[in-house]
């Protein structure tokens, strides 16, 4: 369907990772949630020039359930006025205690659309179709009908992530071309069912509806894990966290250091970044919002991002300048597979390691059968 050499999908917000993986025989998927129809062209122009004609895709995020659903023309600025004072003060106190000074919402977002804005996502896709993209993907629910129709009109497959069997059934019935069975080990927004259980459960559930390829996602860091998922019936592996520790990644050196030092138990599923359950690295930020008795609790999506994104950006900048308390606050989306990451590699090397690990696993299993 996609014309790739090795069914390793690399989701990344970094264009360098996307291009490197596609050139190496995998399939890079560019995360475009933070982009607009105007600035997406710069990113995709660069990818077009650096993939040697190899295929890549784009991922957007159109939540089915959004606190502002049905409201029109919402900007980050207009949302900011609706944030409760208790949440403002709590976030401000965390930053002040760490000696961190954030920018205002006005400086951070200006007149940009609200975070996770559905209308903006569809406009980004329209702009993306001016480039040779070979896949569009969506998370947090069934893609809107307009997105599925766009894909069909351009001959581009539509993928969507599912964290539960019932979600996958709805995706198959809606007409998506590829389902990503994302286990609870995954970084970012995820469900509660493990990858080992979810992959065969979804394959079994959608088979009577129609033939839909299912990719495995959630905690996959090695080629051996990829082989195991494909033994379960997956058509490939959708990965994310492993690329955060690459040389090319958009993550800061401080975060990469924290990743390498972390165990799988340090990847916690909390709401303190986006307002929806999302797995990220445990930090003073996540611990305060989740466990301090004076915490007002997370706001629903999209409000929470207006508090968290600038706060955590400012904390990262301060941490890079040597602020130890700010370093304690630093976090980012990452899955439980972080416990398997112990060094920083180039993206091409990661692809090669996946291939070798996959081959080694298949050879071991074949040898067991032969015995």
Briefly describe each language-model feature range.
Residues 1-193, 197-209:
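Active-site entrance/lid segments in N-terminal catalytic domains of soluble metabolic enzymes
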Residues 74-90, 192-215, 221-371:
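Conserved active-site-proximal phosphate/metal-binding subdomains
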Residues 142, 220-221:
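Residue-level detector of alpha-helix initiation sites
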């Amino acid at each position: 369907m996609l014309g790739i050499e090795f069914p390793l999908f690399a989701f990344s917000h970094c264009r360098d990772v996307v291009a490197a993986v596609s050139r190496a025989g995998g399939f890079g998927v560019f995360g475009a949630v933070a982009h607009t129809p105007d600035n997406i062209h710069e990113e995709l122009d660069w990818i077009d020039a650096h993939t040697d004609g190899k295929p890549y895709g784009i991922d957007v995020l159109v939540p089915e359930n959004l606190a502002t659903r049905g409201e029109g023309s919402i900007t980050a600025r207009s949302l900011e006025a609706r944030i409760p004072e208790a949440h403002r003060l709590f976030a401000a106190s965390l930053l002040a205690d760490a000696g961190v000074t954030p920018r205002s919402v006005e400086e951070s977002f200006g007149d940009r659309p609200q975070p996770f804005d559905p209308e903006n996502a569809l406009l980004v896709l329209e702009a993306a179709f001016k480039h040779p993209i070979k896949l569009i993907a969506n998370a947090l629910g069934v893609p809107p009908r307009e997105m599925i129709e766009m894909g069909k009109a351009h001959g581009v497959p539509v993928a969507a992530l599912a964290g539960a069997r019932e979600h996958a059934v709805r995706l198959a019935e809606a007409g998506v071309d590829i389902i990503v069975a994302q286990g609870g080990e995954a970084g970012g927004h995820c469900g509660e069912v493990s990858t080992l259980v979810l992959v065969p459960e979804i394959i079994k559930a959608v088979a009577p509806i129609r033939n839909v390829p299912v990719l495995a996602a959630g905690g996959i860091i090695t080629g051996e894990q990829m082989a195991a998922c494909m033994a379960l019936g997956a058509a490939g592996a959708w990965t994310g966290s492993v690329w955060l520790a690459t040389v090319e990644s958009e993550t800061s050196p401080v975060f990469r250091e924290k990743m390498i030092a972390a165990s799988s138990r340090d990847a916690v599923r909390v709401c303190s970044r986006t307002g929806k359950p999302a797995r990220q690295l445990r930090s003073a930020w996540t611990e305060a919002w989740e466990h301090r008795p004076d915490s007002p609790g997370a706001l629903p999506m999209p409000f929470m991002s207006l508090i968290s994104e600038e706060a955590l950006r400012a904390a990262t900048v301060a941490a890079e300048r040597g602020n130890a308390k700010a370093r304690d606050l630093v976090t980012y989306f990452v899955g439980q597979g972080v416990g398997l990451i112990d060094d920083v590699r180039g993206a091409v090397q990661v692809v090669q390691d996946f291939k070798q690990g996959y081959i080694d696993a298949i050879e071991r299993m074949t040898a067991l059968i032969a015995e």
